[in-house]
Design a protein with these regions (language model features):
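C-terminal (or distal) subdomains of carbohydrate-active enzymes
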Residues: 3, 10, 16, 22-25, ...
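Metal- or metallocofactor-binding catalytic centers and their adjacent structured scaffolds
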Residues: 113-228
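Flexible glycine/proline-enriched surface loops and loop-helix/loop-strand junctions
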Residues: 67-76, 137-138, 157, 500, ...
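Structural recognition of the beta-strand scaffold that forms the well-ordered cores
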Residues: 8-11, 27, 37-40, 71-72, ...
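Short low-complexity, flexible loop/linker segments enriched in glycine and/or proline
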Residues: 23-28, 202
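Short acidic, S/G/P-rich loop/turn micro-motifs used as interaction or catalytic elements
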Residues: 77-81
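Loop/turn elements at helix/coil->beta-strand transitions in domains of secreted/extracellular proteins
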Residues: 4-8, 33-36, 65-70, 97-101
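Acidic (Asp/Glu)-rich catalytic clusters
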Residues: 27-32, 60-64
Length: 574
């Protein structure tokens, strides 16, 4: 906050019951130290009637001997101000509280007084959490849409200067994104009908950014020299390097059926590029015996902002070295030692770490008012079928397994990769629950009282005490003196942990816009988050896991390389 010129903060949440606070005014400092922010936690009176007894609350919880306090009053719902009657009441009762005098002032005026008394204020170190723990995960569509808009806009802005019209479209997109960070919109606590406009606006921001991104890519393709071979063009629209695998379905014309016989990839210098073919997304073009329109899976390395090409050549073969293994029991493993089986995740000679899914009972309101943690008891565990091997190398092996939990259906696709230490999961959930929470439970490799979580702009060490807290992109689990487990999960926004396990909160199914007390189920109640959801995970294990690598992987998942075809210079066939 200080780096953006904000040295004070008016606190309304967390409440006194949710977090221990030293008083109504204190200094707030991050774990990393540095400049402090003055935090003021005043009482708010959003009612028409004022009483001396009520407003006297503002003189409680002050540092000993502190002679100034703050009272906020008015009427309205997320806005408004004092009425004429309230103003008259304050004037009439200016000195009604013994030893104190009420004066009309401003927040800036009060904070300036606090700055002069900074040394007398207590200090709080760390995050101001938790509050309304249900909001970390409820109504997932708005959270996914907002994060997608943020990353697409960031990608579009990383490219060269845009024309005025495009620049204005991106600016308008950022305004939409900033507006929908509002604490009820992003929190998932608005009415269902309100989210129609919210998602439309965030979709518009995504569309503007996506259009700018692809128009810029097309402009760069025009500048490429002609080539007699068809090319796959890659642009890393990111501020960090990309090292990993890409998937692309090139349109290779009427000779597509020959792909498996004599097509292969080469780079700009005619050197072979390792690859494998996969089933394409359109089922109509898939034939496992003779792929009609294959999806190409290949490795790429790109610097920030770099554009590169690979070329589709003919008359050769795929000489890619096998880097994965499919075992007789349907387990899959990589040459880096990463292994998945139905029993769990393993690396080398390390322990097998189970990954499970559980349903919890959750009768709390939309915000989960009054709760600091969710139930420890699972109502039901997931029931999986038998795994089926889908891809078997040479660069990637995958297994798909379907399951059920409650009334919901799940499909999990597990992958391992040649030369990569992580295990990847794509989890599709068709959510059909009421008053339930879906948690992913992961065993930690070594018990620890502390974990490291990604948070906005940085990371924080947190106690594994079972409290529900928000997360950004990843968590790092286990004793720092032993190999640890890292989970990169950019589509998950809340978790809790104990020394021996962590539970990532995937979905809730509360009534929308329901504030306790309320009827058990209103006739027109809308249950949140029903339908299809997709989650992406990468699991790492080792002694030298760095936060920089975890952030890089999360960034690659959130800001994927842009891939397309280029045919300039190819001979015509029609």
């Amino acid at each position: 906050m200080q780096s953006f010129g904000q040295d004070s903060y008016l606190l309304t949440r967390p409440s006194w019951e949710e977090m221990e606070q030293p008083g109504r005014i204190f200094r707030w400092q991050g774990y990393e130290g540095g400049p402090e922010v003055i935090v003021v936690h005043p009482p708010f009176f959003n009612s028409h009637e004022l009483t001396v007894e009520g407003v006297s609350e503002c003189i409680e919880r002050l540092p000993e001997g502190y002679e100034h306090t703050l009272l906020c009053l008015g009427v309205g719902d997320h806005g408004g101000g004092p009425t004429e009657a309230q103003i008259a009441w304050v004037r009439e009762h200016r000195e009604a509280i013994d030893g104190w005098r009420m004066e009309f002032s401003t927040l800036d005026g009060y904070v300036e007084i606090a700055r002069q008394s900074r040394d007398r204020l207590p200090t709080v170190v760390g995050e101001l959490q938790p509050h309304a723990i249900g909001c970390y995960s409820v109504y997932r569509p708005v959270k996914v849409a907002l994060r997608r808009a943020e990353h697409l806009l960031a990608q579009a802005e990383l490219l060269s200067q845009h024309d005025e019209e495009t620049r204005q479209a991106l600016d308008d997109g950022w305004k939409r994104v900033a507006f929908h960070h509002f604490h009820d919109t992003l929190a998932g606590s608005c009415t269902p009908t309100a989210y129609i406009s919210v998602l439309d606006q965030l979709g518009g921001a995504c569309a503007a950014a996506d259009e700018a991104l692809h128009f810029e890519l097309r402009r760069r393709i025009v500048d490429l020299p002609d080539d007699s071979l068809q090319r796959i063009v890659m642009l890393n629209a990111n501020d960090v390097p990309f090292h990993g695998f890409l998937e692309h379905e090139p349109w290779i014309g009427p000779w597509a059926k020959r792909w498996l016989k004599d097509c292969y990839l080469v780079d700009e210098n005619d050197q072979p590029v390792p690859f494998q073919t996969m089933d394409p997304e359109p089922i109509a073009f898939s034939d496992r015996n003779d792929t009609v329109l294959p999806r190409i899976f290949f490795r790429a390395d790109l610097e920030p902002g770099e554009l590169r090409v690979v070329r589709i050549a003919r008359g050769g073969s795929n000489g890619t070295k096998l880097g994965i293994k499919v075992e007789a029991n349907e387990a899959i493993s990589s040459d880096s030692g990463a292994r998945w089986s139905m029993a769990g995740l393993a690396w080398g000679d390390g322990p097998t770490l189970p990954v499970g899914l559980s349903l919890l009972r959750d009768m709390s309101d939309t915000w989960s008012h009054g709760l600091l943690r969710f139930s420890e008891e699972a109502m039901e565990k997931v029931s999986w079928g038998d795994p089926k091997i889908i891809d078997s190398g040479p660069l990637m092996a995958s297994a798909i397994v379907s399951g059920t939990i409650g009334e919901s259906k799940l499909t999990a696709e597990w992958r391992v990769f040649a030369g990569e230490p992580y295990i990847e999961l794509k989890l599709d959930v068709f959510w059909a629950e009421r008053f339930r929470i879906l948690k992913m439970e992961i065993s930690t490799p070594s018990p620890s009282d502390i974990r490291l979580d990604g948070v906005m702009g940085t990371n924080l060490g947190r106690k594994n005490d079972g409290s529900e807290l928000p997360m950004r992109d990843w968590t790092l689990l286990g004793d720092a003196a032993s190999p640890r487990l890292a989970v990169v999960a950019p589509d998950v926004y809340g978790l809790d942990a104990r020394p021996e396990r962590a539970r990532l909160t995937l979905l809730r199914s509360s009534m929308m816009a329901q504030h306790d007390p309320a009827p058990p189920l209103a006739p027109r109640a809308v249950i949140s988050d029903q339908g299809a959801h997709t989650f992406r995970f990468r699991f790492f294990f080792g002694e030298s896991l760095s936060v920089e690598d975890l952030d890089r992987h999360a960034s690659a998942m959130q800001r994927p390389v842009v891939v397309t075809d280029a045919t300039g210079g190819m001979p015509t066939i029609y």
